[in-house]
Amino acid sequence: MGYKHIKHMKKCSALWACAAALAVLVAGCDKEKKPVEEAVTVPGDAVNLNAAGETANSYIVAPGKTSVFSAQFRGNSKTEAVGAAVSAELLWQDAASLIKDVYYVPETGQVVVSTGKASGNALVAVRDAGDNILWSWHLWVSDYDPAASLWSSPAATGGTVWKFMDRNLGASSADADDWNSKGLIYQWGRKDPFKGAVSFTVQNEDYSYSVTGEPVLYDIDNRAVKATAFENAEGFGAYEKSLQNPTVFYKILKDGDGVNIPKSKDWRDSSDDDAWGGVSLSKSVNDPCPPGYKVPVCAANGDHPYEWHDYSKATWDATNYGMVQDGQWWPACGTRVNYSGGLDFPQANPYSGMWVGTAGKASSDLEANPALYGRYTFVSNGKRLYNKYDQKDSRSQGLSVRCVAE
């Protein structure tokens, strides 16, 4: 039936007859007793996350509240339907009891979520009658109000100014001494997040890791789950498959023998240079940022959103491992490695990359430029050689994102 939250179930032969007669189950068969089954509705006190008329792939959700958002369309699209959803579920949460409840309301096509008092991140999804995931959303559980602390970048060469959030996407703090200021990890062009390292990693001589930095994630019952799986990104319709498998990190393209195929370092078999709006210059359906914000991209005149990033003007915080420039904190976060999906965050050389939604090389020119890249800026100790704001990395790499106002 697609309905959830059956409460106060009684043994009564007339139950289903009553249910059918009422269409939506609102009462039991014994009028003097409590209702046998509740209707699946949106609570009257629920915070509408689409109140401004925008939808997105992530939402900032207040702790200790009940919130509701539309699950009818993909991302910020008004036309690309999610499909025939019948249920919603929590895929993972990075803090126990972060999410208290989540359910789908078929009548309105909305997801209702209730949060605990903690801050953190969660991933929820809707499924169809065949139990297939149709779409998923990142819930950024925090009291954070981005508009209250936006930072305007220095004007680029062509005069473009970007208004940045004061923290990475998914960070529950902007404080340098808080590990939770690091936020989440994304493959270039994907909407779904992965958790970053919760400790520095230690690599062995054979390139295995004795300390992996992998986080503990939880299901709705606070049981530990392995929420990140890894698959080779072979040519099997990876984009649509990624939508059905939002917790799978698609590694660098390989053939059946495990040998790297040199023609592409993308995670998907059909590359899309506009996956994050780098061509259209508009927020894309795959953009991971909440309503009103998007992944920064290069401007039409070629201005780079991190052109202001200058090691000579920045200070490296050797205690908290990050860069401070113009009062903004840019933490080193490490990466998820493109060829394995494992975390890399060495204490001796801590670093991170901030994705830009502009392609490094056009996918249409694959033969001439066989490696497909996304552009990013490098965060590391200024004494290192990586001192330019415009870098390129394979699209299957997992890096950080800092959203800008649309």
Task: Outline where the language-model segments fall.
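Bacterial Sec-dependent N-terminal signal peptides
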Residues: G2-H5, K10-K11, A19, A23-V47
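C-terminal, surface-exposed recognition/capping segments
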Residues: A171, K254, V259-E406
